[in-house]
């Protein structure tokens, strides 16, 4: 097993990601080819530092940009998901005195809205339709992590 793959294995990468990674000689090569934004965000999350750190805030902004890809799938008139993203972006930019607790409260409201708003099948389709776009967003804001 390649050293870079051993490193992501130690971080707890899922079996599917590990199998996919075997096709690549290096993390930068895999990073450039990856179409799974969720995997990329997961890896950055494992490496970006403690909650509240600058590295984490940059990652949160990237994640918010990815989350915005799902907004077209939100039921018309339902504002909680968009508001949650906006609160989270404000926190990441150190604007308005937003706390992690504020984000958690907003996210709970958005999750409650999502529970009744869409069928499981529609959510599944929406999720997979934006993974490649999310991967492109991640690459635009983050270089491949170092081995």
Could you tell me what each predicted segment is?
Residues 1-147:
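Short, glycine-biased loop/turn motifs at secondary-structure junctions and
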């Amino acid at each position: 097993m390649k050293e870079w793959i051993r490193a992501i294995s130690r971080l707890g990468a899922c079996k599917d990601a590990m199998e996919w990674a075997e096709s690549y000689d290096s993390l930068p090569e895999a990073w450039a080819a990856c179409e799974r934004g969720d995997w990329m965000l997961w890896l950055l999350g494992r490496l970006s530092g403690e909650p509240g750190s600058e590295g984490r805030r940059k990652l949160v902004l990237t994640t918010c940009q990815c989350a915005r890809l799902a907004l077209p799938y939100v039921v018309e008139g339902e504002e909680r998901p968009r508001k949650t993203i906006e609160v989270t972006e404000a926190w990441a930019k150190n604007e308005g005195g937003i706390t992690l607790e504020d984000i958690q409260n907003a996210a709970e409201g958005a999750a409650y809205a999502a529970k009744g708003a869409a069928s499981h099948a529609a959510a599944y389709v929406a999720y997979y339709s934006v993974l490649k776009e999310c991967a492109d967003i991640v690459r635009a804001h983050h270089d491949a992590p170092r081995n």
